């Protein structure tokens, strides 16, 4: 007799953690406060509640699907790991120079958002690949070893590697990875040829840096989550919602956590599209208000609008170009820092403002 499918859905937000159990046609749900220091504890508490409602034990769960804003919040709040960038000589400042676009064309005092890594965290090495993948300047292993030794001495936890045109020929990045694995076996490593193998170095470098920046945090969290769920008897496959609205394995998510940016909000947009399809509605505006943020997504023909580049932490009235570009498939939505728990304050001009600070789950 085939075992009945029992699925657990979990969404961790800035204020609440929502847990839903699906068994056949029956749904059981609960809401618990997010536990910031150990988010997995809120999941375990919520799982215990819905299992009690359904009168089953965690061992009967056959699949867990998890959405989270932890990756996004780590980037916005800049509380990731100490990360180094290794890039092609002459391209150290690509992420600081940005592109020629200006998000406020006539503002003579325009202040650009600072890059995720300061200049002294960005290292260069002699190498150059042509656009067709031919080696223009070969890379020297001894130079790599010396540079990795310097990075190790500086106490970096994570390393991002982004070379020019590595999406065509990744040989130089692979050699750096080989040396890092020998000299710094405990370091987290992100290669642009794996994280974002496409042209446009500004977006590619930013995406790779973001992945490296949050990788130690997310890999540690996902490892704790798996162990905690296993200890409670839930030893089923765990999947995570990615930014494009699909799911990826826990192992894949731990390796490429940048794909979890907008993981939680993407789930809300997908659900809204499902409701639109059920009722045959072609034009829908999805609105998802949480305790910390509110998200809006346009859904046309029962399909959420998607994009190939997403900006995290827009700093200038949410204008395009004022954030950090992440080059991943993503459900296109507008997110603002105003939710049910947003805090009111008086700014420097003595005007009343609401958000983006939130009371969260620990006001």
Regions found by a protein language model. Give the residues of each.
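N-terminally biased helix-coil "hinge/interface" segments that flank
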Residues: 1-363
């Amino acid at each position: 007799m085939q075992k009945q499918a029992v699925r657990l859905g979990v969404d961790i937000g800035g204020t609440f953690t929502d847990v839903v159990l699906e068994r056949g046609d029956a749904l059981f749900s609960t809401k618990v406060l997010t536990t910031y220091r150990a988010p997995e504890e809120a999941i375990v508490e919520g799982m215990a509640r819905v299992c009690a409602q359904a009168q089953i034990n965690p061992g009967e769960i056959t699949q867990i699907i998890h959405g989270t804003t932890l990756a996004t919040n780590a980037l916005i709040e800049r509380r990731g790991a100490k990360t180094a960038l290794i890039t092609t000589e002459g391209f150290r400042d690509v992420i600081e120079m940005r592109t020629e676009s200006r998000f406020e064309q006539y503002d003579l005092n325009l202040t650009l958002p600072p890059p995720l890594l300061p200049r002294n965290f960005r290292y260069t090495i002699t190498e150059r690949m042509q656009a067709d993948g031919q080696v223009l300047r070969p890379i020297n292993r001894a130079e790599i070893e010396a540079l990795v030794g310097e990075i190790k001495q500086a106490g970096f936890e994570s390393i991002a590697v982004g070379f020019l045109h590595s999406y065509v020929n990744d040989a130089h990045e692979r050699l750096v990875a080989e040396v890092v694995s020998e000299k710094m076996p405990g370091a987290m490593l992100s290669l642009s040829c794996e994280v974002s193998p496409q042209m446009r170095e500004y977006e590619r470098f930013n995406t790779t840096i973001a992945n490296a920046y949050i990788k130690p945090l997310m890999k540690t969290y996902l490892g704790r989550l798996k162990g905690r769920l296993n200890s409670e008897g839930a030893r089923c496959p765990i999947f995570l919602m990615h930014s494009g609205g699909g799911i990826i394995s826990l192992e894949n998510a731990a390796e490429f956590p940048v794909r979890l940016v907008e993981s939680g909000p993407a789930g809300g947009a997908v659900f809204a599209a499902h409701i639109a399809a059920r009722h045959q509605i072609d034009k829908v505006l999805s609105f998802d208000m949480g305790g910390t943020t509110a998200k809006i997504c346009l859904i046309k023909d029962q399909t959420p609008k998607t994009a190939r580049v997403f900006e995290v932490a827009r700093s200038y009235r949410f204008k395009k170009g004022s954030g950090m570009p992440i080059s991943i498939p993503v459900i296109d939505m507008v997110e603002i820092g105003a939710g049910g728990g947003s805090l009111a304050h008086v700014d420097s001009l003595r005007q009343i403002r609401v958000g983006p600070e939130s009371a969260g789950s620990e006001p």
